């Protein structure tokens, strides 16, 4: 199974306090045939030096000459990726040790080209919640809500041709929609917690009205009928309210 190279795409920007833990979680993978492509997006702190502290030849540091955002950093890394499979990990998130081994095994055995998983939510290294995604996500289901965490995704690289991350808000969500629609496939949940998503100040204080506007904008590129677009946005709102109510009930305000 280790015959297949996995290219891990990691964008970074001013992540000196978290990127070492993220890279360490890759080094702990029980699946050994990988390359980690870290693309630094013109950081002003010591992020690049933190990456260079690791001597493993599978870790490759790339740099953008000027800040292009997460989409631009991921796209730069994708240009240098040579793996059969593509995985994604941000510079503040963490993988569990058998993530790649389990997911690649399931994908090969079941002919799955798009896999994601469940993840824990951490804040200051403490677990504050978890996200359990649907077992299968179709294109129409994805239009209602993005249940796919980028940090959990593994793709067959053929799905990315001709796609890359667009320079829009919610760029990962936009890419998943493009892939599922163009290939007429469903994404499949591996069924276990494979990653840890670290809450950042931006995610904690995100403006819900801005998120609604961004969701509306993304839907505009995929749903022509205005009434259908409203339908999908209402689904997005209802799912968000249910999630907020669940979090409030469980003390995760």
UniProtKB/Swiss-Prot annotation:
Domain of life: Bacteria
Subcellular location field: Cell inner membrane
Stored InterPro entries: Glyco_trans_2-like, Nucleotide-diphossugar_trans
Gene Ontology molecular-function annotations: hexosyltransferase activity
Topological type in the membrane: Peripheral membrane protein
Pathway participation: Bacterial outer membrane biogenesis; lipopolysaccharide biosynthesis
Cofactor(s) required, per the database record: Mn(2+); Mg(2+)
Top-tier EC class: transferase
Major location (coarse): membrane
GO BP of this protein: lipopolysaccharide biosynthetic process
Record field: catalytic activity: N-acetyl-alpha-D-glucosaminyl-di-trans,octa-cis-undecaprenyl diphosphate + UDP-alpha-D-glucose = beta-D-Glc-(1->3)-alpha-D-GlcNAc-di-trans,octa-cis-undecaprenyl diphosphate + UDP + H(+)
Keyword vocabulary terms for this entry: Cell inner membrane, Cell membrane, Glycosyltransferase, Lipopolysaccharide biosynthesis, Magnesium, Manganese, Membrane, Transferase
Family named by the database record: Belongs to the glycosyltransferase 2 family.
Role played: Catalyzes the addition of Glc, the second sugar moiety of the O152-antigen repeating unit, to GlcNAc-pyrophosphate-undecaprenol.
Protein name as it appears in the record: UDP-Glc:alpha-D-GlcNAc-diphosphoundecaprenol beta-1,3-glucosyltransferase WfgD
């Amino acid at each position: 199974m280790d015959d297949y190279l996995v290219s891990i795409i990691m964008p970074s920007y001013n992540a000196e306090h978290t990127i070492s833990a993220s890279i360490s979680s890759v080094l702990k993978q029980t699946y050994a045939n990988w390359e980690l492509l870290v693309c630094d997006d013109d950081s002003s702190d010591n992020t690049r030096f933190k990456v260079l502290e690791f001597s493993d030849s599978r870790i490759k540091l790339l740099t953008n000459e000027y800040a292009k955002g997460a989409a631009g950093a991921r796209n730069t890394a994708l240009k240098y990726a040579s793996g059969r499979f593509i995985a994604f990990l941000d510079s503040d998130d963490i993988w569990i040790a058998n993530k790649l081994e389990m997911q690649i095994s399931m994908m090969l055995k079941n002919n799955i080209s798009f896999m994601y998983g469940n993840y824990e939510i951490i804040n200051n290294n403490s677990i504050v919640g978890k996200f359990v995604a649907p077992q299968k996500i179709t294109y129409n289901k994805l239009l209602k809500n993005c249940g796919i965490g980028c940090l959990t995704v593994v793709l067959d690289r053929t799905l990315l041709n001709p796609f890359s991350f667009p320079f829009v808000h919610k760029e990962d969500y936009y890419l998943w929609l493009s892939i599922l629609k163009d290939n007429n496939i469903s994404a499949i949940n591996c069924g276990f917690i494979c990653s840890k998503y670290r809450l950042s100040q931006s995610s904690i204080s995100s403006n819900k009205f801005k998120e609604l506007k961004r969701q509306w904008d993304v839907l505009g590129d995929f749903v022509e009928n205005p009434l259908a677009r409203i339908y999908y946005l209402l689904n997005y709102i209802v799912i968000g309210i249910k999630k907020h109510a669940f979090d409030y009930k469980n003390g995760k305000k």
